[in-house]
C-alpha cells in the first residue's frame, strides 16, 4: 500500500510550508496527513496546523534517526521534508534505512550536502562552475570592511562585519572556524 503521509522535521515556525503540504495533499488523498516534529512542539506554530506534532531530540542525538524511523512506521510516512540544514547530512547518510521502509527523504546526495555544509567547499564548487564569490582576505593583513563567518555555520550565528582594525579582536582572529572574506555591499 502506498504511503502518502508526510513528515516535516524541525517544523518550528514553518506554518506556510505545513499548510501548503496539507492543502496540496488533500487534493490527492483526503485521508493523508501531514505530521511535524520539533524539539519543543508546544512552541512550534507549525505543529498546531499539522495533524500532529511529535517531540524529537536535536538531530545530533544518538537516537534521532531511530526515532524518525519509528515515526515513519507508526504514522505510515511516505515522504520526509527536512527544514534545517543541520539535518541534511544525517538524513542523507541514513537515506537507505528510510528507503527500506518505502520512505522518500527529500535530501540531495551525501557528497552534495558535504559541499553545502562547509563554506570552503561551497566556494570551491561555485568557482569551479564559473560563479564568482567574495575573495578571501588575509586576516593578518586585512582590507576593511571585511566579513567573517564560520565555515560550518548555520542560522547566521557568529557572523562578524568588521569595519576597522580595533573590531578585529583576538577572539575573532584566533577562531579556527572563521573564514575572512571581502565585504560585498548590498548596493553593488
State the predicted function of each range.
Residues 163-188:
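Phosphate-binding site of ATP-dependent enzymes
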Residues 41, 152, 185:
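Short, glycine/acidic-enriched loop or turn micro-motifs at the edges of active sites
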Residues 42-50, 139-144, 170-173:
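Short loop/helix-cap segments at secondary-structure boundaries that form the rim of catalytic
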Residues 99-165:
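A conserved helix-loop-beta module that forms one wall/lid of the active-site cleft
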Residues 84, 150, 182:
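Short secondary-structure boundary segments
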Residues 12-14, 85-87, 139-140, 165, ...:
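Short beta->alpha connector loops
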Residues 1-106:
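ATP-binding N-terminal substructure of ATP-dependent carboxylate-amine bond-forming enzymes
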Amino acid at each position: 500500500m502506498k504511503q502518502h503521509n508526510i513528515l516535516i522535521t524541525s517544523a518550528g515556525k514553518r506554518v506556510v510550508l505545513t499548510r501548503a503540504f496539507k492543502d496540496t495533499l488533500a487534493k490527492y488523498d483526503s485521508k493523508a496527513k501531514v505530521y511535524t516534529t520539533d524539539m519543543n512542539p508546544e512552541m512550534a506554530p507549525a505543529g498546531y496546523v499539522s495533524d500532529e506534532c511529535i517531540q524529537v531530540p536535536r538531530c545530533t542525538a544518538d537516537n534521532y534517526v531511530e526515532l524518525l524511523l519509528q515515526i515513519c512506521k507508526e504514522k505510515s510516512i511516505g515522504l520526509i521534508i527536512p527544514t534545517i540544514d543541520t539535518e541534511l547530512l544525517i538524513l542523507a547518510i541514513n537515506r537507505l534505512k528510510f528507503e527500506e521502509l518505502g520512505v522518500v527523504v527529500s535530501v540531495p546526495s551525501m557528497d552534495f550536502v558535504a559541499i553545502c555544509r562547509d563554506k570552503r567547499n561551497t566556494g570551491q564548487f561555485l568557482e569551479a562552475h564559473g560563479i564568482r564569490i567574495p575573495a578571501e582576505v588575509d586576516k593578518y593583513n586585512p582590507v576593511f570592511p571585511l566579513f567573517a563567518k564560520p565555515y560550518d555555520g548555520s542560522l547566521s550565528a557568529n557572523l562578524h562585519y568588521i569595519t576597522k582594525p580595533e573590531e578585529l579582536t583576538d577572539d575573532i582572529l584566533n577562531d579556527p572556524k572563521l573564514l575572512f572574506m571581502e565585504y560585498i555591499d548590498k548596493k553593488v
